[in-house]
């Protein structure tokens, strides 16, 4: 049996090089009270100042350096907010919290990020000021949230539903910083594909903006062989009233497709084969029969990869009323194909790059059921890539897709415009959901009287309500300031005017806001205020901030350099 001293002697110190998990992590820096809040507020101010310059029709652009490519020029609040990363850890914490406000508003409403940022700054700033004078931060937060609930209820009362394409165009124009062309093109797109239809934004190839409406199921796979071309008008293959054979597997054997060809021939209908691939004997036989006998057939590779391909093929089967061969869990063999296994479409157009199936003859109830399945998946998924793919599939099964192609003279111009188009698109969707209120910050100003009827439980809650009263004036003041006029005077004049009057910063005059088309989606204004108040009032309750102290890296190269210099010197003489 070992005695205690012997045990101690046998224990060896473990090298930290050999066991890096035993090394100490970064040391922490802790700041308390007013010092921590003051530093965080400077970060909030820096970010909010950078974002606020973009607000309103006379707002300026922000140029952001990028690690690759040319600098980005934008007027999009959330893009500016995301680009800011401060060196000082405490300032950065303040900036990041307001960045979260902009991100949340962008994800929920798709617009209003600049409004959310300036509101958050105002609430945080006023909150810090009152707390430093001895107010209770928890009660202030309660007062703030009480006031916000009252404002949201008042916004819902003010809200009017969007009914006409003109109103949709007005919402889009305001969100795109007064660009009427963008407003009109978005209104046209919504007219064509419906308010719930899918509208995508892409880079255009020309100087002008273009709108393309894609009806039916279009996917980016063309014919496998150019020998399938059957028309002299362009390099494409066109069929009317055709059968569709869908296969998840590769088709190489000619025996497997003969039954489908015989069915198509017996019914005197063309056949479209969509499979993982068609090659070898099967492809050469199809091409030979196409050229020699005039067989009406075209082979196309299935779109997508993995699960996405399976889902798209299943969508096609439901839309055309057919079945997918080679699908897991089903024992369907290509050799046993029956007429009811083939999909039916009114028209097919296949080019070298893409294929389009129009007027699918699928069961309407089955299509509707599939659409509902995709909508449910959309609600659950958090991945942006998944959402994009699900939206594409949804569009193909419903009213089709509108593609907005944004034109311009350079990449920088196109990217700046694309940001505005995306914002405008999100704003119109939000307007269709919850209706519209007065724009230019007026809707929030008109909610101030509703706060007078609130009864706070104590003096600190009353301070919270007063903070929101002053904060509601900030968006209108910022828009006026960016237009080069005194914000507080403008706000005072709006408050004294009748309820539908506001300030048009573009022309510098007081106008009937609805009549002039200066309107905002209710959802955007509501989300901006709710997100700003939630995060900023929580920020004011902070008493301690903990950050990491970065380790100072020693430069390993300097000693070697000195020695090298000495050696070189010796060699020279």
Curated annotation (Swiss-Prot):
There is a cross-link at residue 551 (Glycyl lysine isopeptide (Lys-Gly) (interchain with G-Cter in SUMO2)). Belongs to the chaperonin (HSP60) family. The modification Phosphoserine is found at residues 67, 70, 410, 488. The keyword Ubl conjugation applies. ATP binds at residues 75, 111-115, 440, 520. The keyword Isomerase applies. This is 60 kDa heat shock protein, mitochondrial. It comes from Pongo abelii (Sumatran orangutan). Keywords: Acetylation, ATP-binding, Chaperone, Isomerase, Isopeptide bond, Mitochondrion, Nucleotide-binding, Phosphoprotein, Transit peptide, Ubl conjugation.
């Amino acid at each position: 049996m070992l005695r205690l001293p012997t045990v101690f002697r046998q224990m060896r110190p473990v090298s930290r090089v050999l066991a890096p998990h035993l090394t100490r992590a970064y040391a922490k820096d802790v700041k308390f009270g007013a010092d921590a809040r003051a530093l965080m507020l400077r970060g909030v101010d820096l970010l909010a100042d950078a974002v606020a310059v973009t607000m309103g029709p006379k707002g300026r652009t922000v140029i952001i350096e990028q690690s690759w490519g040319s600098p980005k020029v934008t007027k999009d609040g959330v893009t500016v907010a995301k680009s800011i990363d401060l060196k000082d850890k405490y300032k950065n914490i303040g900036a990041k919290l307001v960045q979260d406000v902009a991100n949340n508003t962008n994800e929920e409403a798709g617009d209003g990020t600049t409004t959310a940022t300036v509101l958050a700054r105002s609430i945080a700033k006023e909150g810090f000021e009152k707390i430093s004078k001895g107010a209770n931060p928890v009660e202030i937060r309660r007062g703030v949230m009480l006031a916000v609930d009252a404002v949201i209820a008042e916004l819902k009362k003010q809200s009017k539903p969007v009914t006409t394409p003109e109103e949709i165009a007005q919402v889009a124009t305001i969100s795109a910083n007064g660009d009427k062309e963008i407003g009109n093109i978005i209104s046209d797109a919504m007219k064509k594909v419906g308010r719930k239809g899918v509208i995508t934004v892409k880079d255009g190839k020309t100087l002008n903006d273009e709108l393309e409406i894609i009806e039916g199921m279009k996917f980016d796979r063309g014919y496998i062989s150019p020998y399938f071309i059957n028309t002299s008008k362009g390099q494409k293959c066109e069929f009317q009233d055709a059968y569709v054979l869908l296969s998840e597997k590769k088709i190489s054997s000619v025996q497997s497709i003969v039954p489908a060809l015989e069915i198509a021939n017996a019914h005197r209908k063309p056949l479209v084969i969509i499979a993982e691939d068609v090659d070898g004997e099967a492809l050469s036989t199809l091409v030979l029969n196409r050229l020699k006998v005039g067989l009406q057939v075209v082979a196309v590779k299935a779109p997508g990869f993995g699960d996405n391909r399976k889902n798209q093929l299943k969508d096609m089967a439901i839309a055309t009323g057919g079945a997918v061969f080679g699908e897991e869990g089903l024992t369907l063999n290509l050799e046993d194909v029956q007429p009811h296994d083939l999909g039916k479409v009114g028209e097919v157009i296949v080019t070298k790059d893409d294929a389009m199936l129009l007027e699918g003859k699928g069961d309407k109830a089955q299509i509707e059921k599939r659409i509902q399945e995709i909508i449910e998946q959309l609600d659950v998924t958090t991945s942006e890539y998944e959402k994009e793919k699900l939206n594409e599939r949804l569009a193909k099964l419903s009213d089709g897709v509108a593609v907005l192609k944004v034109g311009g003279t350079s990449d920088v111009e196109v990217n700046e415009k694309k940001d505005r188009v995306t914002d405008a698109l999100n704003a119109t969707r939000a307007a269709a959901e919850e209706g519209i209120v007065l724009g230019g910050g007026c809707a929030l100003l008109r909610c101030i009287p509703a706060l007078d009827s609130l009864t706070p439980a104590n003096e600190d809650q009353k301070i919270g309500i007063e903070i929101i009263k002053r904060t509601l004036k900030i968006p209108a003041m910022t828009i006026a300031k960016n237009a080069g006029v005194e914000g507080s005077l403008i706000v005072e004049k709006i408050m004294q005017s009748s309820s539908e009057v506001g300030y048009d910063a573009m022309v510098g005059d007081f106008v009937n806001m609805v009549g002039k088309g200066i309107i905002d989606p209710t959802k955007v204004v509501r989300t901006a205020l709710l997100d700003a108040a939630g995060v900023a009032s929580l920020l004011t309750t902070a008493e301690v901030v903990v950050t990491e102290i970065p380790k100072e890296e020693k430069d390993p190269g300097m000693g070697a350099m000195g020695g090298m210099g000495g050696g070189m010197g010796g060699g020279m003489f």
